[in-house]
Amino acid sequence: MRNENTPIAVEGYPFIAIAGVLTLILAAVSWHAPVVWAGTAFFLTVTLFVAFFFRNPERITPGNENAVVAPADGVVIYLGPAREEHLGVETTKISIFMSVFNVHINRAPVSGTVLDTFYVKGKFLDVRDDRATFENEQAGLVIETARGLRLAVVQVAGLIARRIVCYAGKGDRLTRGGRYGLIRFGSRLDIYLPTTTEVKVALGEKTVAGETVLGILP
């Protein structure tokens, strides 16, 4: 499983290269046609924004092995009971909304083994709409911890973010706080925890992937 620690996620390289080349071409043309400077400035801004979007910062994960860390940067937009079909039980669901300004690298919420993966084709509704959980395109992992506890984490594509990237596969071993995927240009992460988890976040709270503790497993 890939787990790059480059300052910018490799998935961003093609976008940065295209925007960068266009910037250089327009910059060269602008020496002879000053009016083109506006286009040069525009594509330079785009290049910088794309690099900013795909930034891949290091994170310091809490030492408590029972702590479930946020899989994504963003804001908690849902917190409550929910049944997750791949787990087959009632769970505590926490949903995190990622705007285009958040880091979009996704991190493993716990250490454990990937028991199953799933991908569901679907719509591209605004991910702040709870229907997105059931109707949008999504990819998920079922993870089992060393103590036999199971949880699921689901990447949900959105109105703008229509490209889910997941490095993890069935049988892979995840390390809490380790990178396992990303979603391009804003989206949502749903995490389904055992109902006995001691929740440590509230609606509207900001999260930092790999650092914010969502809850403590029993």
UniProtKB/Swiss-Prot annotation:
Active site (UniProt): S187
Topology relative to the membrane: Peripheral membrane protein
Co-factor binding comment: Binds 1 pyruvoyl group covalently per subunit.
Molecular function GO terms recorded: phosphatidylserine decarboxylase activity
Site (Cleavage (non-hydrolytic)) residue list: G186, S187
Pathway: Phospholipid metabolism; phosphatidylethanolamine biosynthesis; phosphatidylethanolamine from CDP-diacylglycerol: step 2/2
One Pfam family, short name: PS_Dcarbxylase
An individual GO BP term: phosphatidylethanolamine biosynthetic process
EC number(s) stated in the UniProt entry for this protein: 4.1.1.65
InterPro entries: PS_Dcarbxylase, PSD-A
The protein's role, per its UniProt record: Catalyzes the formation of phosphatidylethanolamine (PtdEtn) from phosphatidylserine (PtdSer).
Family per similarity comment: Belongs to the phosphatidylserine decarboxylase family. PSD-A subfamily.
Official protein name in the record: Phosphatidylserine decarboxylase proenzyme
The organism of origin for this protein: Geobacter sulfurreducens (strain ATCC 51573 / DSM 12127 / PCA)
